């Protein structure tokens, strides 16, 4: 009550923020006549003068903001024939301050972005503008590029499929770079797999504006960016697990309100949390079918994992809802955009389980070579901002995860769209009949209708019903996306009927003419509520742009997934009380609120899932940053490795003494020097005379052995120029580092897969994950030190000319393996396509130059079996 009175007197927090911006907008407006009076050359000169002062540090961005915004507005009037509205100036200031600007559909977000983009590009440190697809990135870079070029700023775009380093470098070196979230993220990962600093394409992460920020930072947050390579694991387990899963019977969960109630059947599905629980009866049955005594023994861990994924594939994932089968492949359907996610695969074996279910070719599992999340990638920028039409529903998450405020920007013209209360029916059949009747009424009077569906399957059901009703219409879904722009552009024509999945929620504006305005504008019909209120709001937002009339209404049924799983009991009770007959519906604000509460429940669950993912990735992210920082040091031509090599050599010798059971304080007569010398020879090919070490104390052996190895190494390297020596050391160190990091990521994957089971032992899985991942990282560092010393000691040099050729060839081979042998894949919190790497024949000379066969040298120290496997 008190807060309501406070808001009435002082306005909301958003209102108070807007008032501050309005004062500044008034001042910017006073500058308009000054810049209008200038000719083109004078306007450019005024901008360049401001730009020079910013670059020299004489003026800060805040000090030049008013003039720069006024200049950009004037330049836009001349070049683009568009003048920034006052509310667009407010949006520009919000973005410049590193906040999220929530702007309704049709309010010109693309034009708004030009203001902070130009302002921040003046520093010369680069500005990135992120869009949801290549088409929008190219379109915006081309259209807005005319304005940027007029002001002397360079603009470029990074597109998928164009991976030439020189092309990418040119794009990132431009003042302004457009591209998609996945391309920016993958370029970051690719850069940290390069063997020469000059091949890196990205520069510092200065300022980024994310268009459709809710889609990228919220919806895509559960999608890790992963570069992956092949594994040698067999695929037979997926087929067997699929056969077993189909023989198990689905049951009901135990009723918490009934004492001693037990779950029935072989397994229980929790649709709310999207999990499967196998009952005792199910475990016994599965063990018989697999022919094992204990399904949950360590040696059967892979079997139980395959079975879990097979049960998920059959009971939680629907064809034409969560995925489609296209060209004999399982392709994911993005639940938020409705588009096909080509090249993306579910991980942890789920995609293979779906392939087994659909009887298509099962592709190999993959191993992580490099990964990050969008949360951690975008948090690297010094300043992050975003814009979207729908952000307030996720304001808490933006604040907690990204430290971003959401500011709702007033519309330039009041919204005239009428949003009607939901209509709720008992069954889906009744609901769809009512939808068809409503479409028919609107079509007969000429009012265009856009019908939103939550899945491909539902869009095709409606399509068949409209065909029977003889109502002409267009269908837009992931199976028919090629004509998307044309279908959406025509959706506002008189009498048009368009059925669309969530694809219609963003991107292209639907324009209407005066005749359609007189008929009430575009009519939006939603056939069910999405789990996220934002997706519903995006659908509604297709109507009523820039003050146009329009109308929206959602038709629901108690059989819809959202109501069935999360909230129908209360609504069903109301319908029963009111005695609703077949074909009748409820329309009340109370029911609409109940539906929104169900959506809030789901949003809360998803938020917790994303937060959970981030908590785990934050652990890995600290390790990732440490490794990448060290990698950058190695790539620095001025970095001298001599001290690091000497330190590692001493630690390596101490490790060898431990392995030979030569301990500090032991009796020197008991030391097995012969065994120690054999270990050294097997490890790094160095022959040590036993007599040099016999009769010495522990400290003396440590010092003597370190001295011998150092002396031999220095003698070997003395024939090289200092720069050659440094290059060889760095190349070998990078090779060891990348192999060790790759193996570490594999072990981290295994750890993450099984860590949830610790909860059954009354232990917090996250705390356990932090402890064990730290131990794995300590092992990684130790392995890195010892393996690097081994590699350096094993190097056998030829003549200087031969060595130069060998070093150059080796660098080229290593980079080829990264560039050609890898595929860059996103995977959805869950596997990426199998990747082919160039393989060195086992009996070929080792590329490190040791003179040994590959199988006896680096091939022997390749990825080992994970410690938790």
Curated annotation (Swiss-Prot):
A GO molecular-function annotation: ATP binding
Its EC number(s): 7.4.2.8
NCBIfam families from the UniProt entry: PRK09200.1, PRK12904.1, secA
Protein name per its UniProtKB record: Protein translocase subunit SecA
Record function comment: Part of the Sec protein translocase complex. Interacts with the SecYEG preprotein conducting channel. Has a central role in coupling the hydrolysis of ATP to the transfer of proteins into and across the cell membrane, serving as an ATP-driven molecular motor driving the stepwise translocation of polypeptide chains across the membrane.
Assembly and interaction partners: Monomer and homodimer. Part of the essential Sec protein translocation apparatus which comprises SecA, SecYEG and auxiliary proteins SecDF-YajC and YidC.
GO cellular component: cell envelope Sec protein transport complex; cytosol; plasma membrane
Cofactor: Zn(2+)
Organism whose genome encodes this protein: Campylobacter curvus (strain 525.92)
Pfam families with a match to the protein in the record: P-loop_SecA (PF21090), SEC-C (PF02810), SecA_DEAD (PF07517), SecA_PP_bind (PF01043), SecA_SW (PF07516)
Region: Disordered, residue numbers: 818-869
Residues the record lists as binding ATP: 88, 106-110, 509
Residue numbers binding Zn(2+): 846, 848, 857-858
CDD domains named among the record's database cross-references: DEXDc_SecA (cd17928), SF2_C_secA (cd18803)
UniProt membrane topology term: Peripheral membrane protein
């Amino acid at each position: 009550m008190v807060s309501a009175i406070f808001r009435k007197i002082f306005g909301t927090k958003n209102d108070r923020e807007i008032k501050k911006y309005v004062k500044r907008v008034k001042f910017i407006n006073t500058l308009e006549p000054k810049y209008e009076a200038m000719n083109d050359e004078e306007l450019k000169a005024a901008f360049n003068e401001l730009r020079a002062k910013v670059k020299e540090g004489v003026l800060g961005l805040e000090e030049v903001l008013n003039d720069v915004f006024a200049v950009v507005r004037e330049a836009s009037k001349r070049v683009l024939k568009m003048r920034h509205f006052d509310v667009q100036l407010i949006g520009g200031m919000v973005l410049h301050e590193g906040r999220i600007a929530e702007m309704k559909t049709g309010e010109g977000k693309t034009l708004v972005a030009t203001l902070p983009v130009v302002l921040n590009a003046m520093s010369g440190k680069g500005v990135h503008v992120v869009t949801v697809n290549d088409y929008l990135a190219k379109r915006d870079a081309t259209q807005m590029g005319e304005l940027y070029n007029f002001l002397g700023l360079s603009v470029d775009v990074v597109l998928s499929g164009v991976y030439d380093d020189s092309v990418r470098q040119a794009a990132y070196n431009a003042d302004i770079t457009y591209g998609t979230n996945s391309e920016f993220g993958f370029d970051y990962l690719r850069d940290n797999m390069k063997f020469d600093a000059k091949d890196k394409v990205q520069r510092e992460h200065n300022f980024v504006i994310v268009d459709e920020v809710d889609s990228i930072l919220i919806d895509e947050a559960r999608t890790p960016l992963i570069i992956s390579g092949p594994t040698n694991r067999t695929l037979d387990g997926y087929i067997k697990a699929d056969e077993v899963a189909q023989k198990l019977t689905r049951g009901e969960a135990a009723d918490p309100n009934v004492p001693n109630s037990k779950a029935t059947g072989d397994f229980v599905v929790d649709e709310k949390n999207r999990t499967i629980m196998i009952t005792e009866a199910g475990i016994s049955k599965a063990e018989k079918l697999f022919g094992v005594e204990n399904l949950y023994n360590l040696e059967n861990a892979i079997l139980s994992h395959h079975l879990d994924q097979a049960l998920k594939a059959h009971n939680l994932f629907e064809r034409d809802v969560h995925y489609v089968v296209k060209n004999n492949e399982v392709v994911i359907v993005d639940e938020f955009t409705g588009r096909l996610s080509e090249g993306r695969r579910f991980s942890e074996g789920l995609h293979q389980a779906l392939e087994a279910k659909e009887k298509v070719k099962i592709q190999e599992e993959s191993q992580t070579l490099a990964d990050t999340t969008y949360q951690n990638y975008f948090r690297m920028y010094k300043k992050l901002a975003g814009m979207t039409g729908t952000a307030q529903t996720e304001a808490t998450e933006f604040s907690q995860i990204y430290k971003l405020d959401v500011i709702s920007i007033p519309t330039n013209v009041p919204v005239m769209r009428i949003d009607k209360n939901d209509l709720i029916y008992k069954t889906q059949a009744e609901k769809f009949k009512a939808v068809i009747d409503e479409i028919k009424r609107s079509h007969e009077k000429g009012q265009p209708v856009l019908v939103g569906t939550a899945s491909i399957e539902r869009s095709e059901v409606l399509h068949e019903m409209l065909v029977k009703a003889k109502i002409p219409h267009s269908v837009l879904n992931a199976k028919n996306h090629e004509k998307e722009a044309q279908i959406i552009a025509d959706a506002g024509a008189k009498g048009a009927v368009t059925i669309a999945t969530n694809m219609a929620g963003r991107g292209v504006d639907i324009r209407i003419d005066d005749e359609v305005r007189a008929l009430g504008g575009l009519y939006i019909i939603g056939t069910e509520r999405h789990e996220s209120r934002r997706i519903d709001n995006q659908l509604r937002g297709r109507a009523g742009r820039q003050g146009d009339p329009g109308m929206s209404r959602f038709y629901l049924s108690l059989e819809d997934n959202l109501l069935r799983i999360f909230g129908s009991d209360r609504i069903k009770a109301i319908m029963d009380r009111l005695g609703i007959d077949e074909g009748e519906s409820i329309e009340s604000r109370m029911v609409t609120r109940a539906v929104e509460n169900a959506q809030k429940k789901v949003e809360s669950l998803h938020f917790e899932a994303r937060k959970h993912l981030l908590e785990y990735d934050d652990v890995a992210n600290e390790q990732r940053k440490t490794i990448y920082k060290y990698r950058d040091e190695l790539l620095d031509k001025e970095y001298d490795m001599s001290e690091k090599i000497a330190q590692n050599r001493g630690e390596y010798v101490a490790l060898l003494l431990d392995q030979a059971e030569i301990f500090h304080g032991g009796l020197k007569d008991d030391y097995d020097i012969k065994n120690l010398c054999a270990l050294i020879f097997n490890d790094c090919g160095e022959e040590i005379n036993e007599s040099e070490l016999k009769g010495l104390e522990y400290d003396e052996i440590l010092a003597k052995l370190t001295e011998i190895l150092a002396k031999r190494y220095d003698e070997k390297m003395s024939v090289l120029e200092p720069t050659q020596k440094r290059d060889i050391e760095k190349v070998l160190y990078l090779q060891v580092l990348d192999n060790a990091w790759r193996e570490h990521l594999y072990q981290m994957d295994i750890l993450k897969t099984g860590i949830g089971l610790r909860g059954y032992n009354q232990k917090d899985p996250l705390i356990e994950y932090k402890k064990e991942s730290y131990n794995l990282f300590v092992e990684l560092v130790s392995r890195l030190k010892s393996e690097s010393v081994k590699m350096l000691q094993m190097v056998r040099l030829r003549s200087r000319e031969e060595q130069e050729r060998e070093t150059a060839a080796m660098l080229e081979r290593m980079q080829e393996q990264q560039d050609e042998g890898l595929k860059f894949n996103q995977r959805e919190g869950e596997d990426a396509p199998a990747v082919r790497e160039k393989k060195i024949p086992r009996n070929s000379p080792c590329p490190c130059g040791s003179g040994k066969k590959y199988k006896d040298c680096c091939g022997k120290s390749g990825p080992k079996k994970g410690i938790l496997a």
